[in-house]
Regions:
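Oxyanion-binding/catalytic loops of NTP- or PPi-dependent enzymes
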Residues: 2-114, 122-124, 138-141, 145, ...
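Generic recognition of long tandem-repeat/solenoid scaffolds
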Residues: 80, 130-135
């Protein structure tokens, strides 16, 4: 009997040893679940690598990790991401963006007309929902969830190409104030893209996870999410490992695109002052827009940025090469009033949450526009403390979603999950 027990014990020890050696020396399994940040202006996809315990945000073939949430329809096909964005100026009526503003929402005809005013593409009212009119070699309509499905399919294919495996499951983030219908339509979009959604997680919670706040002792977390087109400020209350979104406010018409537009308008004015004419070709306008966007990014890290763009101008001016030096101070002056608007929803969530600003334990920055030095300075001066900048703000949400995807996929080493407490009374207070 003792011999049999000894043999059994040796067998169990051998199994444990084999498992340990397997973990140490065999390649870890491929991730099975992807995490997707389906943003208003940009999308990102990430995975949690088993064994390594690391999140990887996947880039496209050019290494870009933030992909435009744009879909353009042409006679030759459907173009998503950067391909779609590149067609926006030449094909404005059939290039759809900001679909997230419409997905799952019910509108009166009057509300939809107001919401669709800024867009060149046509938005139709169908039984309370929005649809987009497309006219290529035929005329048809598409839904916001179809547009979202094309973006999600693009993320899915990027992940599959990078990992070398087929992907069928995902965790997706949504704004904390999305109601049940908006969440269901987002899941429907994922299903159209061939993805089973294991969990829908709130964007502020995902960001808090990326910063590791689900594992540390903090109570009140303020999340400032300033992306390309929207500002969302959320006040999270952490109770153990559980997050409750206590209050939310923002501005659905404020973001990096608005800052770009101010700078672009300044450049147009300078061109007109210098040459007495404006660019005439859509391609030139697109190139100038790209140059201004690049300059804005450069001014995040430096004090000056040079733009040099060949232009074809209307009238007798003809072809010229426009060159100018843009400064950070100029950029800040042009957008001073917009930057100050960020404080309004911050003050509102503190009021709704019945919290003094001194009671905020952690300030988390999300969205590429929070990289702008003046914006960080305004927030720091208001609170008298520096915001947490340990994570790339543009990738904070997708990092948190990928962590949750790893948890849902049973990846090891085991991670601490974030549990969300539903707040059925949560309503986002919008400012303009």
């Amino acid at each position: 009997m003792a011999g049999e027990m000894s043999i059994l014990g040796s067998a169990i020890l051998a199994l444990f040893l084999a498992g340990y050696l397997g973990q140490q020396y065999l390649p870890p399994p491929k991730p099975k679940v992807i995490g997707i940040d389906l943003g208003t202006t940009f999308c990102s996809v990430g995975v949690f690598h088993p064994g390594l315990g690391e999140v990887e945000v996947i880039g496209d073939l050019q290494g870009r990790k933030s992909i435009p949430s744009v879909v353009s329809f042409t006679v030759s096909g459907i173009h998503s991401g950067y391909e779609g964005q590149d067609l926006a100026d030449a094909n404005p009526l059939n290039t759809i963006y900001d679909a997230k503003r419409f997905i799952g929402k019910l509108f009166t005809p009057e509300d939809l007309e107001r919401e669709s005013t800024p867009y060149q593409f046509q938005v139709l009212h169908r039984n309370g929902s929005a649809e987009f009119s497309i006219s290529t070699n035929r005329t048809f309509t598409v839904t916001p969830e179809y547009i979202s499905s094309r973006l999600l399919l693009n993320m899915k294919k990027m992940a599959e190409g990078h990992l070398g495996v087929l992907i069928s499951k995902a965790v997706i983030s949504v704004p904390a104030d999305f109601d049940e219908r908006q969440r269901n339509y987002t899941v429907r979009a994922a299903n159209l893209a061939g993805l089973e959604v294991l969990r829908v997680i709130n964007e502020p919670t995902a960001a808090a996870m990326a910063y590791g706040l689900h594992k540390v002792d903090v109570l009140n977390v303020l999340v400032v999410d300033l992306g390309g087109g929207t500002l969302d400020v959320s006040l999270l209350n952490k109770q153990g490992g559980m997050f409750l979104t206590r209050a939310m406010a923002g501005n659905n018409k404020l973001g990096g695109q608005d800052f770009n537009q101010r700078l672009l308008q300044h450049v147009f004015t300078r061109v007109h002052e210098q040459y007495g004419a404006l660019p005439s070709h859509e391609g030139d306008i697109h190139t100038l827009r790209q140059a201004v966007e690049a300059a804005k990014l450069n001014l995040t890290f430096g004090q000056t940025s040079v733009i040099r763009v060949p232009l074809s101008l209307r009238g007798s001016a003809g072809s010229v090469v426009y060159e100018d030096v843009l400064t950070r101070q100029l950029f800040e002056d042009l957008n001073a009033d917009l930057f100050q608007k960020i404080l309004t929803p911050i003050e509102e969530v503190l009021r709704e949450g019945r919290l003094d600003k001194s009671e905020v334990d952690e300030i988390v920055l999300v969205g590429g526009s929070t990289r702008i030095p003046r914006i960080r300075q305004i927030i720091a001066q208001y609170f008298g403390m520096e915001p947490n900048t340990s994570v790339d703000p543009e990738l904070a949400v997708v990092t948190g979603v990928a962590l949750q995807a790893g948890i849902m996929g049973g990846s090891w080493p085991l991670q601490v999950s974030a549990i969300e407490i539903p707040n059925r009374h949560l309503r986002k207070t919008n400012f303009l």
